[in-house]
Amino acid sequence: MTNFYKVFLAVFILVCCNISHAAVSFIGSTENDVGPSQGSYSSTHAMDNLPFVYNTGYNIGYQNANVWRISGGFCVGLDGKVDLPVVGSLDGQSIYGLTEEVGLLIWMGDTNYSRGTAMSGNSWENVFSGWCVGNYVSTQGLSVHVRPVILKRNSSAQYSVQKTSIGSIRMRPYNGSSAGSVQTTVNFSLNPFTLNDTVTSCRLLTPSAVNVSLAAISAGQLPSSGDEVVAGTTSLKLQCDAGVTVWATLTDATTPSNRSDILTLTGASTATGVGLRIYKNTDSTPLKFGPDSPVKGNENQWQLSTGTETSPSVRLYVKYVNTGEGINPGTVNGISTFTFSYQ
């Protein structure tokens, strides 16, 4: 009888000590500041290389490995949400607005900054798929980091950003785990910071208004539709800061919506059936006209120089072209504007 009680007691203790329950408690702060107080960051970029991202690494961030204490098989993931307005995108990631000139790229996720999820939009999204703790006590953390973005074309300037609420991360129990009344959401505010933004550009050495005298020709020199004859030539010269790549767009001043390669003649022209095309350097393909804008990627924008040239220039050739509508002799006048983009 004595031996029976000893065995029963041993089995009871073994079963008792392996019973555990999933549990979670909040050990973090509900309000958290991202980045150092009064941070200051400096960078230099070409004027139209926009949006321009300040490569601040993980310096503007918040990281805490101990926000929730979990145990006993508790399963937890993380969701994140940004409350700032979306003002653009870069490589599929939202740019969030802080001021008219400054925006943010934002990442949220687990404790490790490098695993942060690039945030897009203003809805809750999965930023950490999660894990299940074993029969022991551990913690779940989180991280947020941001990078400032210059949004608008401007000369060199200093931008100050005030403390701003940016969004939240919430703990997401799964696989039967429940948080009960435990705090699941933490909020984040971006500490104030200053950007010292230096821009580089170019100076036009050629007069801003260039008149190209067009040679007189006879209709017989353009016998068929599409035939061309050189009418005149000119050059554009610039002086650039180091590292600036110059792009340019021609705009048809008479018909700004023109996206073809034939310049519209002005109302002062009396000739018909003839147009003007513009070529650069030794190109065999005429330049097309686009919107009057310096924005990077502007329609029909073309590269004038590389970033290694500080004194770039381009030779332009104007050619008459038979438009196929029957040529009637007269005067030919056309006006095109050039817009430079410093990238």
UniProtKB/Swiss-Prot annotation:
Span list, region Disordered: 287-307
Binding-site list for a carbohydrate: 65-66, 110-111, 138-141
Disulfide bond sites: 75-132
Annotated spans, Fimbrillin-binding domain: 200-343
Gene Ontology molecular-function annotations: carbohydrate binding
Biological process annotations from GO: adhesion of symbiont to host; cell adhesion involved in single-species biofilm formation
Compartment(s) where it occurs, according to its Swiss-Prot or TrEMBL record: Fimbrium
Signal peptide feature range: 1-22
UniProt KW keywords: Disulfide bond, Fimbrium, Lectin, Signal, Virulence
Biological function: Essential fimbrial adhesion factor that mediates binding to N-acetylglucosamine-containing receptors in the host intestinal microvilli, leading to colonization of the intestinal tissue, and diarrhea or septicemia. Also confers adhesiveness to laminin and basement membranes.
Similarity field: Belongs to the fimbrial protein family.
Descriptive protein name: F17c-G fimbrial adhesin
Native source species: Escherichia coli
